[in-house]
Amino acid sequence: LANHDNQIVFGTTNGMTISTGLEYGPDNEANTGGQWVQDGGTANKTTVTSGGLQRVNPGGSVSDTVISAGGGQSLQGRAVNTTLNGGEQWMHEGAIATGTVINDKGWQVVKPGTVATDTVVNTGAEGGPDAENGDTGQFVRGDAVRTTINKNGRQIVRAEGTANTTVVYAGGDQTVHGHALDTTLNGGYQYVHNGGTASDTVVNSDGWQIVKNGGVAGNTTVNQKGRLQVDAGGTATNVTLKQGGALVTSTAATVTGINRLGAFSVVEGKADNVVLENGGRLDVLTGHTATNTRVDDGGTLDVRNGG
């Protein structure tokens, strides 16, 4: 389809190429061209090129769509195995997307009332660590389930969004302003921002969970060569710090849990029973205290003047 053509699909169509439909710009309801998949309609193996639009209305379904840069899919029905090669997928209320692969500055927008499952994110982190670029990768305001974030991939979970069962590999990251549940960091990073919560995160070798001022993490497990950083004003409770795991924090944070010595805590300016190793660090600020601290190989205890 080209030159403002329009295909309305009530039955089944295969192998179409769409290069028109976005005359009014991305994700604009004023667009009327392109391929429209209606209730009961199915489109398979569609190619959407620059300027092209595939619109999937409620009750419609598509599979194996490939979207290049400048093309988009407006989804209110179901989409399976969409590949975004620089293209965009906009999920509207009621939409379900399964198996989307996001490449080469592609963008999946998971809006409230939508569910994205088994997404693979290979782009979004090109702007550097924890950059709020927000227009590549996966942008979650609904529900994202079983997402895999690879090198250069980024998932941004906004305040109203939830990410469940995410795996983050080295070079990828997850930025949390909403809720993240059951994240596994296999060398990847998780940033928990003010108002964000992360529950049951597992930090494996070279992984890093950073809990910022106003962020909250619960039930984090830090395995050997993993790292948990809790900034001033951040909170991490029920931490399990395994031997060889690193805790980086200060007495201006709140951290509780267990390590190989037993229960430890950093609460209201008082640190007790903290183990520091493998890059672990505790800054004891002026007027604060630390008792029973154990500093092993690679650990640092910094006591400020008056601490």
For each of these PLM feature ranges, what is it?
Residues 1, 203, 222:
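Calmodulin-binding IQ motif alpha-helix
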Residues 4-6, 11-16, 21-22, 33-35, ...:
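The right-handed parallel beta-helix/beta-solenoid scaffold, focusing on the short coil/turn
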Residues 26-28:
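Surface-exposed intrinsically disordered loops and tails
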